């Protein structure tokens, strides 16, 4: 029985201004700035009901703290509010943010606090004197304001010196204190406000786990970049203030955490009492009216667009019996696009296959009608399954139907029929993930198929190009655990042994020792291969760029079991780091590899994985190009240990060490590097 399919309404928390429309990710991560004991007691001064209000509240509190140092706080607020100098106001806000954090960091030192108040008083006096007009010392540099700017630079230097003296030279303590004393307490207050409860100390200490894992990694990466910049370029008020401002965005990283709350855990909504009077129909609820869907499947091109309604020349949905309320059934982001799906029956064997080219399927709660034949199951009808007689034998998964490109008129006289290699195993493809933003369900495993040629009365296998198969979008209704999102995923059908494509599948990687079941993303590394012109540049780093290509080629596919993928990602990050500093350190460490047996064993493991890579031949061609155009193997026998292992894994005979095919054009006399100029021209030195 086909039932109405409705998307679940978004979860709305009491008092919240926005709706949570997407599914939250798995939230589990610790911020680098907050450790185990950092949130034992949380009691911040800034409180509010909404997470998104925190950055603005911090800025306002910082300005208030700075203006309190002046003689007339109201006059300072008026000057700041009425000013149109955007750059000047930004400079003051940056100074105020760092000033307030410095006050909190030096609360235990009266002497330091006195010095800070003095700096704040002088700074606010400059604001009053300047007036934040168009030509202001707080804005861009001007010759008329260079004396006032020198005073401001001196005050900023004093502020930084006070912070350094009271934090042991570690300015990162400011961001740590901000997270511990302000950010996490604010998150706790928002949770207590929205849920009408009081959090116990244990729950408060675990608030850091609410931050999205990917977002937390981004924050940690930005922290590392900030530390690196500070070491290279020194400190400045603007840089430190922007780093603190980044920490204030942490509450916004709780991506829809409330969406994970079960509906039965939410507060009971207040239901109004029914109005007095007789209840129509004896108080019984009217049965929902079924949706009649008439679908005409033709052998020509057809596409269905149900952004508001389904109405196409090839596929038509009749909603005359029932109006679909888009507030409950939102199809605005569900698109069924079969523009690239073709069925050509012109070359099929008439004796072995017989069916009509079109069928009419009608969906309702109790029946499925067809103009040509009665389908055996409601599931095959609701998913738009094509009978075996339409295009040969098409084996589909439990939730999706694929139509293959079999247009033989432009290829040859023999038709091509796509059949499944897993037809006898009964294995089905599972829906591994659902993207809530694009409303698309993604199949975790590709549909494996083989192309056969049909020649009159005999059928033979043949080598063919890769055929792109798109699963047929279906309503997916009446099936247990109904999937309401539309399926539109590209599936690669492996049909040939052409170089640079996938050879059968990734089964070769099952032989890689501890990483059994490891599969790689196909052709993802091609985007990282630079052009020949770029290789000729005098600043081109052939070694790091080539190792980057190998690192991308070794990126595990999502179909790899998670424990294997996680273990291999760790090995890949250690041996092929995406960081020039770490790569140089590893290269130096491998110069005496015999003293590091564990590292040597890991290198051998990675070499074995590279040896069994399904696109090894293509990677070997790229290595040859790097050697020929960028001088990758100029050192030959003296090539470093990491690069040597990678090349040995790709080129098993070791010919790269002395072979003429790997001679770089740079080794030839009279050949110089090419310089890439700004205007795109090239010249030789």
UniProtKB/Swiss-Prot annotation:
Comp. bias intervals (Basic and acidic residues): 315-337
Comp. bias regions, Low complexity: 291-304, 417-429
Region (Actin-binding and polymerization): 497-669
Keyword Secreted: yes
Compartments it resides in: Secreted
Gene: sipA
Region feature Disordered, mapped onto this chain: 265-386, 404-432, 494-514
GO MF terms held by the record: actin binding
Protein name per the record: Cell invasion protein SipA
Family: Belongs to the SipA/IpaA family.
A single GO cellular-component term on record: extracellular region
Job of this protein: Actin-binding protein that interferes with host cell actin cytoskeleton. It stimulates actin polymerization and counteracts F-actin destabilizing proteins. Potentiates SipC activity; both are required for an efficient bacterial internalization. In vitro, forms a complex with host cell protein T-plastin increasing actin bundling. It inhibits ADF/cofilin-directed depolymerization both by preventing binding of ADF and cofilin and by displacing them from F-actin. Also protects F-actin from gelsolin-directed severing and reanneals gelsolin-severed F-actin fragments.
């Amino acid at each position: 029985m086909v039932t109405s399919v409705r998307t679940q309404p978004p979860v709305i928390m009491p008092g919240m201004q926005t709706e949570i429309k997407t599914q939250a990710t798995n939230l589990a991560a610790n911020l680098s700035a907050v450790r185990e004991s950092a949130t034992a007691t949380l009691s911040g001064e800034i409180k509010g009901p909404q997470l998104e209000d925190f950055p603005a509240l911090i800025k306002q509190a910082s300005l208030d703290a700075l203006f309190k140092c002046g003689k007339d706080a109201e006059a300072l607020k008026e000057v700041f509010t009425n000013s149109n100098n955007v750059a000047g106001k930004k400079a003051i806000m940056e100074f105020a943010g760092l000033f307030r954090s410095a006050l909190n960091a030096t609360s235990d030192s009266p002497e330091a606090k006195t010095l800070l108040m003095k700096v704040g008083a002088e700074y606010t006096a400059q604001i009053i004197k300047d007036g934040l007009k168009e030509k202001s010392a707080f804005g861009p540099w001007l010759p008329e304001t260079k004396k006032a700017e020198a005073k401001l630079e001196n005050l900023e230097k004093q502020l930084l010196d006070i912070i350094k003296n009271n934090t042991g030279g570690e300015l990162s303590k400011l961001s740590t204190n901000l997270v511990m004393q302000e950010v996490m307490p604010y998150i706790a207050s928002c949770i207590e406000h929205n849920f009408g409860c009081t959090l116990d100390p244990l729950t408060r200490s675990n608030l850091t786990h609410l931050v999205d894992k990917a977002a937390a990694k981004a924050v940690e990466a930005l922290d590392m970049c900030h530390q690196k910049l500070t070491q290279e370029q020194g400190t400045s008020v603007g840089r430190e203030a922007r780093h603190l401002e980044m920490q204030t965005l942490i509450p916004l990283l709780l991506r829809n955490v409330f969406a994970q709350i079960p509906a039965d855990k939410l507060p009971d909504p207040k239901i109004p009492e029914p109005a007095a009077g007789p209840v129509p129909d004896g108080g019984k609820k009217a049965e929902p009216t079924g949706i009649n869907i008439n679908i005409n499947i033709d052998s020509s091109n057809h596409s269905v667009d149900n952004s508001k309604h389904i109405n196409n020349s090839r596929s038509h949905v009749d909603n005359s019996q029932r109006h679909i309320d888009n507030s409950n059934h939102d199809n605005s982001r569900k698109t069924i696009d079969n523009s690239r799906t073709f069925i050509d029956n012109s070359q099929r064997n008439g004796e072995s296959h017989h069916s009509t080219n079109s069928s009419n399927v009608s969906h309702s709660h109790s029946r499925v009608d067809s103009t040509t034949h009665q389908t055996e199951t409601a599931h095959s009808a609701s998913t738009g399954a094509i009978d075996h007689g339409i295009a040969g034998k098409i084996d589909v998964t439990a939730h999706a139907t694929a139509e293959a490109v079999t247009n033989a008129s432009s290829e040859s006289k023999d038709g091509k029929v796509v059949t499944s290699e897993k037809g006898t195993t009964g294995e089905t493809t599972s829906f591994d993930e659902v993207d809530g933003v694009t409303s698309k369900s993604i199949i975790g495993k590709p549909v494996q198929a083989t192309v056969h040629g049909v020649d009159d009365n005999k059928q033979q296998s043949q080598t063919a190009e890769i055929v792109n198969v798109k699963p047929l979008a279906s309503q997916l209704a009446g099936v247990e655990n109904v999937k309401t999102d539309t399926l539109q995923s590209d599936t690669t059908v492996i049909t040939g042994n052409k170089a640079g494509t996938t050879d059968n599948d990734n089964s070769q990687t099952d032989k890689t020792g501890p990483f059994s079941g490891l599969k790689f993303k196909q052709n993802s590394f091609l985007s990282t291969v630079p052009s020949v012109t770029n290789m000729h540049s005098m600043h081109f780093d052939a070694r790091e760029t080539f190792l980057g290509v190998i690192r991308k080629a070794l990126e595990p596919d999502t179909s790899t079991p998670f424990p294997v993928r996680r273990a291999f990602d760790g090995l890949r990050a250690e041996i092929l780091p995406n960081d020039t500093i770490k790569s140089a350190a590893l290269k130096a460490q491998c110069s005496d590899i015999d003293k590091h047996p564990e590292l040597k064993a890991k290198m051998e493991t990675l070499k074995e994985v590279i040896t069994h890579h399904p696109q090894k031949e293509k990677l070997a061609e790229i290595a040859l190009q790097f050697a020929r155009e960028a001088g990758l193997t100029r050192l030959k026998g003296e090539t470093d240990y990491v690069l040597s292992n990678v090349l040995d894994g790709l080129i098993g005979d070791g010919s790269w060490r002395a072979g003429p095919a790997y001679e770089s054009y740079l080794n030839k006399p009279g050949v110089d590097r090419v310089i890439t100029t700004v205007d795109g021209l090239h010249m030789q030195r």
